[in-house]
Amino acid sequence: MLRHTRNKCLSIIPRRYLFVPSNSFTDSKKKNVIRAKPRVKSTPKIMEDEAHQKKPQIDKSLIAKAKKDLRELRSLAKDVSEYIEPKDIDSLTTTKKISTELPPIDIDEATEDIFQEISDSKGKMKKHPKALPPSLSFPEKINQRLGLVSDLLVSRESTSNLPEKTRNDKWNILLTQLNAAGGFKELSEVDIRSFVNKIPLRSLRNLIPFIENMYHEAGVSVHYNTYYSFIRALSLGASISDTQIQVIEGYFNEIEKQTELKMDHYETKIAVYVKNKNKKKIEEVLGVMKAKNLPLSKSIYKSILSSYVYYTKDHRRAIEVFDSMKFLSESTKPDAKVYAQIIISCMMNDDIDKGLDLLQEMRDNNVKPNQSILSALAKGCARSRQHKFQAWNHLFQIYEYGWTPTLQTFEHMLYISAKDGDVELTRALFYKMLETNSVTPSAFISLMLAYANYQSPTSRTEPFLVSLTENGRLFKQNIMANVDFSKPIHGFPFLPTSRIPDGKFILAESSAIWAYTIMHNPSFVNNPHVAAPYLNIAYELGEFNDFKDRLNESTYLNDEGIPKVREIEIIEPNEETESPDSELQVVEPNENDTGLVKSPILNKLSGHLKDNRHKAPRDSMIYQIALDAAGKFKKFDFAQEIIKERGQFRKSNMFKKLSSKEQTKQDFQFAEKLVYCYVKMNLIEDAYSVVLSSVDRFPWGWKQLVPLNTAAINLGSSELAAAVRKIAQSNQVKHHGKIKSNDYKKYVMKRGY
């Protein structure tokens, strides 16, 4: 900066300088300082020579022999384990051998492989090193007795994350080795309890008698925490038998001898009695807690709620318990799991609007929905004509949250596409399940349901639900592009094409799949819920011969509990005897049955199907489908056979086990189907006689009587139509389906307008 002055002096230019004080360390270069080493007393040369002479020489052959022995020992341990517990390989978990059962599937476990197949991910699963996890580190004395057997607990390297990995569970072999090496003898109770706590509950439930015997042989008393672990292991699963309840109650008595029951024990007790459907025991436990001034915890409320949702199926009570949890206290406010239970109850009882309101309530209360909620809403919406367009949107929200779809979610995808009649997408999704070794009975039912709901492109008037959004179209396009039906998986008989030409294609493929399932997975076809859509395929797409053939070869009358009255009947020698299992005679294929679409394998298996091992017992749903078929194909004699056999079915144990409310409900449904059957045959007087004979028992309304009223008008029977309308009007008033004029006037007077 320049500055001019009046006396014309030289210009002053200010500058800045940095003054650094002198330092001897900075002025001179650093020198490498050599540290002094401590003096070590030198060893005489004579002593070094002696040391070299004393050092032993290691034989390399001994090292090689030791390594060889170690490898042989490990191989022997694996061979022994495979000999003790042979593997059960089935047709849907390996390509080398086709067995007769599917892999065990746990619905609650996530399946990463399924998600990767859907999203066409090319990433590889992270491999775990073959070492015992820290969570399975045993006490030192137990490790000494186990030796190398503990390596059996490590799962083999696999690219699959499916529940089939539980087959490598070798805890029984490990306990056998421990028992042979001394068992629990001379071990502290703490070490024993630490070891038992390492066993997963699903494995522990089958090993409890063996462990108790080891305790007894060692003379060690079982700690109450170990008894509690036994109880938790036995309480796994959806239901608990009376025999298991007796064992569990015995363990609770042993716990009470050692300590006073705590809140955790009471919570488990109630959960156990809920799964046993024992209301009396639940009330007793609640009474004991009330006497001890123990408040009801959130876990107890959840157990009671689950009893109403899954066991007693009382939706009204479930709503009451849920509302109590909301307004009782801050500690009992519902979380995402509680919301999931009540929303599932809404979907099971077709209360879709209530379920959607609860979802909005969760978002208002900043409660993040979980995958179970969105999956249940998707399935529930698919069953509603009004809300079916929202089904796929709920499923796609799972991907928006970045969650990995569970096996249950994938099953719901199959159900939604099957309910919509999208056979191509359902076949592709089922093919993906075959690739990932995760086929379940629910998935098989959905496949049969898709076949039953198939409509040809010319007769279908609505687009598929998945095609209504851009995400849905891309989803279906990606799935179809990644499936090649020309490459069968495990020999599953999909026809080698992704396009469905006509109904004959559906009949042929479903028959081939049914034959394959009988040979490889017979447990699938023993369920009436599987047989019902299989029969509906023939009802919708086939002829009467197709339907009757499937009815006789896939279902049978379970005569347990039916009185053997027919045994005393006198039968002529030339007269053919009737089948003891069913009044419906098996239709043998002949030259006239040219239109029968049936797999040739089923004809070869007909001899094995006579013992009913590979058939489903007939229930009310099967008889209703049979009546529909009799009405559609106008087979009056067949309808009479169904009515007669349905009367026998009502005497069986299968029907008697139902509650009186459920029995009345099923009888009303059968009577309704019988009226429709007679109407289709133009037998309106017979249909009216069915209504008239049961008018005092069943709530006949316009919903059930409109077809009969319409048929009477079309046939010119005005008197019968008037009688039908009179029954409908009187039942509306009787069953509170219509308000009377006087009651309406009182209602308006109280309301004020």
Curated annotation (Swiss-Prot):
Domain of life, per UniProt, equals Eukaryota
Q: Which GO terms describe its cellular component?
A: mitochondrion
| A UniProt-annotated Pfam family | PPR_long
Q: Name one GO biological process term.
A: RNA splicing
Principal localisation:
mitochondrion
Report the locations given in the UniProt record: Mitochondrion
Any idea which residues the transit peptide spans? Answer: 1-76
In the record for this protein, the PPR repeats are positioned at 262-296, 297-332, 335-369, 370-405, 406-441
The record's keywords, sorted A to Z, are: Mitochondrion, mRNA processing, mRNA splicing, Repeat, Transit peptide
Q: Which NCBIfam families match?
A: PPR
Q: Which family does it belong to?
A: Belongs to the CCM1 family.
Q: Which PANTHER family did the record assign?
A: OS03G0856100 PROTEIN, OS12G0638900 PROTEIN
Question: Additional comments on file?
Answer: Involved in mitochondrial-nuclear incompatibility, a major determinant in reproductive isolation between species, through hybrid incompatibility of Ccm1 and its interacting partner 15S rRNA between yeast species.
What the protein does comes down to: Regulates mitochondrial small subunit maturation by controlling 15S rRNA 5'-end processing. Localizes to the 5' precursor of the 15S rRNA in a position that is subsequently occupied by mS47 in the mature yeast mtSSU. Uses structure and sequence-specific RNA recognition, binding to a single-stranded region of the precursor and specifically recognizing bases -6 to -1. The exchange of Ccm1 for mS47 is coupled to the irreversible removal of precursor rRNA that is accompanied by conformational changes of the mitoribosomal proteins uS5m and mS26.
Summarize subunit and interaction data from the UniProt record for this chain: Binds to mitochondrial small subunit 15S rRNA.
| Descriptive protein name | Mitochondrial 15S rRNA processing factor CCM1
> Which species is the source of this protein?
Candida tropicalis (strain ATCC MYA-3404 / T1)
- What is this protein's gene name? CCM1
